[in-house]
UniProtKB/Swiss-Prot annotation:
Family matches, as Pfam families: GidB (PF02527)
Function in brief: Specifically methylates the N7 position of guanine in position 535 of 16S rRNA.
Species name: Staphylococcus haemolyticus (strain JCSC1435)
Name of this protein: Ribosomal RNA small subunit methyltransferase G
Subcellular locations according to the entry: Cytoplasm
This protein's record includes keyword Transport: no
Enzyme class: transferase
Annotated stretches, region: Disordered: 218-240
GO molecular function terms noted in the UniProt entry: rRNA (guanine-N7-)-methyltransferase activity
HAMAP family: 16SrRNA_methyltr_G
Residues noted as binding S-adenosyl-L-methionine in the record, renumbered to the chain: G78, F83, A129, E130, R147
Keyword list, A-Z: Cytoplasm, Methyltransferase, rRNA processing, S-adenosyl-L-methionine, Transferase
NCBIfam families: rsmG_gidB
Keyword set includes Cell division: no
Length: 240
């Protein structure tokens, strides 16, 4: 069974039926990822089955627990080669996706990828999340996602300022999410967020444990956050 057949079968078990067009989009995504990866570091995973399992399937797992089948505005922080937002966009074409990444080479790849996949309502921004979160897009997104970018204490300060009041920040972590959540509660509260839900599950074929943490944005974030680039990582918001 090749990668796309495997993905279609696994998603079908969760009530997601891929059309022929969507299958073609994933196959093109895989081909371009491997091609571009030869000239820039997009991923350490290039084996076909591994990409379909650990990148494509893994990116779509949030939709097993959260309704993405609606015209949400999504900002994906530090998405690298487009994970999780581009696989989600392929499955749920109504999503309006913005990706912010600090490396211009990755933005070039994403622009080429979106054109080849025929995606609309996607935009790719070359910026640091700390700077982007201070600009006109602050507090405008229904959902902000981040997948394995940094510890939750840091991620909260990068992502929550972008979430509009009433929206959600969805952090996708491997194991240790609960431990990170405990450490991040203080900062989440300062930034206007409240813990809502977390889901722990295993990827197929013993490919590892995953955690999805959902934070509700209840209040506007103080204008002093996010702090200047590098500060959230150097001195995260922790209870003294």
């Amino acid at each position: 069974m090749n990668g796309i057949e495997w993905l279609a079968k696994e998603l079908s078990e969760h009530g997601i039926e891929l059309s022929d067009k969507q299958k073609e989009q994933f196959q093109t995504y895989y081909r371009l990822l491997v091609e571009w990866n030869e000239k820039m570091n997009l991923t350490s995973i290039t084996d076909e089955h591994e990409v379909y399992l650990k990148h494509f399937y893994d990116s779509i797992t949030p939709s097993f627990y959260y309704d993405f089948n609606q015209p949400l505005t999504i900002c994906d922080v530090g998405a690298g080669a487009g994970f999780p937002s581009i696989p989600l966009k392929v499955v749920y074409p109504e999503l309006k996706v913005t990706i912010v990444d600090s490396l211009n080479k990755r933005i070039q790849f994403l622009n080429h990828l979106a054109a080849e996949l025929g995606l609309t309502q996607v935009s790719f921004v070359h910026d640091r999340a700390e700077t982007f979160g201070k600009g006109v897009n602050r507090e405008t997104y229904d959902v902000v996602t981040a997948r394995a970018v940094a510890r939750l204490t840091v991620l909260s300060e990068l992502c929550l300022p972008l979430v509009k009041k009433g929206g959600q920040f969805i952090a996708l972590k491997s194991s240790k999410g609960e431990e990170e959540l405990e450490e991040a509660q203080f900062g989440i509260s300062i930034l206007g967020g409240v813990f809502s839900d977390s889901y722990t599950f295993d990827l197929p074929e013993d490919a590892g444990e995953r955690q999805m943490i959902i934070i509700d944005k209840r209040r506007q974030t103080s204008k002093k956050y996010p702090r200047k680039p590098g500060t959230p990582n150097k001195s995260p918001l922790l209870e003294n």
